[in-house]
Amino acid sequence: MCGTEKIFINNNEIKLEAELFLSSAENLHKATLICHPHPQFLGI
Amino acid sequence: MYNNVVSGIFNNFIQNNISCLRFNFRGVGNSTGNHSNGTGELNDTKACVDFLVNEQNIEKLLIYGYSYGAAIGCSTVNYSKNIIGYCAISFPWDFMGLEYKKLSQCEKPKLFIQGNRDRLAIYENFKTHYDFYLDPKRYKIINEADHFYLGFEQEVAKETYEFYRSIIE
């Protein structure tokens, strides 16, 4: 997806794979955080 | 990093110019570490909240989670005053235990999305779980959808976007 950035977020010794989109100034300081499912839970 | 439900929500937020971050829990995809039965995953979510608040200067944050991500993500709702509510899609209460139901209790706005053919987040038990939660809250039943929402991604994305608009804008 254009405009997104693939990043890693550090959580102590863990590196979390993430994708970030930052909007223009109109929506600055507001955001959503989306938690992926766990594939084992979905049985896939 | 792909899931049809999450990608539908994520892409819809982008199209509407809303900042968003999605992530894989530890041990999933290219995230390092191993699954830790929820304890570490709660910390993973908090680390993402800290990243948005401290490094991206986000002041108002809505949490969205699907399936296992709903149970874990929504259970961090009381972690920060910057989290102003959550949307849980197919919260798997019956598989996750009472701990996550209690952790996700709050007086912040909540939206629960549920398919009426879901056998993992069991539809027949949905209303009992929903009634546990304090107001403000609301729910949306997606007719004919099971846990995977194939073919219903746009409907889910539309609901999640409208929830965002009703809370933040």
Residue ranges of predicted features:
Chain B
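Catalytic histidine neighborhood in serine/cysteine hydrolases
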Residues: 132-148
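Catalytic histidine-centered segment of alpha/beta-hydrolase-like enzymes
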Residues: 32-33, 145-156
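Short beta-strand/loop motif that positions the catalytic acidic residue
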Residues: 106-107, 111-114, 118
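Short alpha-helix in the alpha/beta-hydrolase fold that links the catalytic acid
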Residues: 99-100, 108, 121-130
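Active-site nucleophile loop of the alpha/beta-hydrolase fold
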Residues: 66, 87-96, 115
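Acidic catalytic loop of the alpha/beta-hydrolase fold
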Residues: 116-121, 147-148
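Serine-hydrolase catalytic machinery in alpha/beta-hydrolase-like enzymes
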Residues: 1-56
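Gly/Ala-rich beta-loop-alpha elbow adjacent to hydrolase catalytic centers
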Residues: 65-73
